[in-house]
């Protein structure tokens, strides 16, 4: 039986106690590796509980934390979906490393792996650049590639609202600019989050979850655009450890990945940067949250496990 521990550790911002989960396989199962998960925007780490329990049955320890401004890391009276006034992206990436240090100390002899979903995939990409060689394999799920003109334009808009209303503010204009197009691909829409999943029950659970779905702040948009720009620069891409295998895995109908095109572009960029072992897996008919598509869940879980098993 899986044993899940909950604990807190200090964020690199020097003030926030981050909530973390550690799911440990039954002691009768041989431990093979540790997988650290970085979750997406406007959600929380406990949404990955079912996936963690599956991997526990395969002997893989699973851990993750709620990012700054998310889930149970949000302090009372704090601003949801907000990394902070300054250096937010840096803090979020450094927090991933903070948990990595805890895990690598506790499980010294086990391979350390990482998986990032959506915003977590972009944080993971920054992590692979800033902390090369710390992880023995990486999975980038629900990721994409943004054209330079979109990053430049989006950054100008975000900065305008940031200086006008502050980083903790929200903007309907920016939210529509960032996410509105995602849902239009699936019109007529049943909800504002149809783009997440073809599984209506999953979408409804997301909407009903009080720790999901809050509008991202202007500050987080600014931070994320800056992080994506950092990730896509060739001068940074070549800083990654070329020997760290990477799996790009997404739904073919995921608008975050431009219906597969942005995922392929990211995959090509990693190969061009010298990463030796890059795998691409796209699922026809699946949207953004491929772990939560019940019709294909067993297949997706199994494919991820099979890929990890090449290295652990």
Tell where the protein language model's regions lie, with residue ranges.
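Short beta-strand/loop motif that positions the catalytic acidic residue
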Residues: 248-250
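Alpha/beta-hydrolase-fold enzymes
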Residues: 124-211
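Alpha/beta-hydrolase fold nucleophile elbow
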Residues: 106-118
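Catalytic active-site module of serine/aspartate enzymes centered on a nucleophile-bearing elbow/loop
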Residues: 271-273, 277-312
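N-terminal cap/lid segment of alpha/beta-hydrolase-fold proteins
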Residues: 1-27
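Alpha/beta-hydrolase active-site loop
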Residues: 84-104
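Active-site glycine-rich loops that stabilize anionic/oxyanionic intermediates
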Residues: 32-35, 39-43, 118, 252-253
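Conserved alpha/beta-hydrolase
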Residues: 47-78
């Amino acid at each position: 039986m899986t044993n899940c521990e909950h604990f807190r550790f200090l964020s690199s911002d020097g003030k926030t106690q981050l909530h973390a989960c550690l799911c440990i396989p039954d002691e009768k199962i041989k431990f093979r590796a540790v997988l650290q998960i970085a979750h997406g925007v406007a959600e929380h780490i406990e949404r990955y509980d079912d996936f963690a329990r599956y991997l526990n049955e395969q002997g893989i320890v699973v851990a993750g934390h709620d990012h700054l401004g998310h889930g149970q890391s949000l302090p009372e009276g704090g601003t949801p979906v907000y990394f902070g006034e300054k250096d937010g992206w840096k803090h979020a990436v450094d927090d991933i490393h903070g948990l990595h240090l805890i895990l690598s100390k506790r499980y010294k002899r086990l391979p350390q792996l990482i998986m990032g979903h959506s915003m977590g995939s972009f944080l993971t990409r920054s992590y692979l650049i800033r902390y090369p060689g710390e992880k023995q394999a990486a999975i980038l799920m629900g990721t994409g590639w943004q054209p330079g003109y979109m990053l430049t334009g989006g950054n100008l808009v975000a900065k305008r609202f940031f200086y006008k209303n502050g980083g903790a503010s929200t903007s309907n204009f920016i939210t529509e600019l960032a996410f509105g197009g995602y849902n239009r691909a699936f019109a007529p829409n049943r909800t504002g989050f149809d783009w997440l999943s073809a599984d209506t029950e999953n979408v409804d659970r997301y909407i009903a979850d009080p720790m999901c779905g809050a509008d991202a702040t202007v500050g987080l948009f600014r931070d994320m655009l800056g992080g994506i720009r950092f990730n896509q620069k060739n001068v940074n891409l070549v800083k990654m450890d070329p020997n760290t295998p990477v799996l790009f895995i997404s739904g073919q109908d995921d608008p975050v990945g431009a219906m597969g095109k942005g995922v392929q572009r990211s995959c090509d960029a990693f190969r061009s940067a010298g990463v030796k072992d890059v795998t691409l897996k796209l699922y026809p008919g699946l949207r953004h949250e491929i772990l939560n598509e019940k019709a294909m869940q067993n297949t997706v879980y199994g494919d991820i496990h099979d890929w990890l098993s090449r290295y652990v």
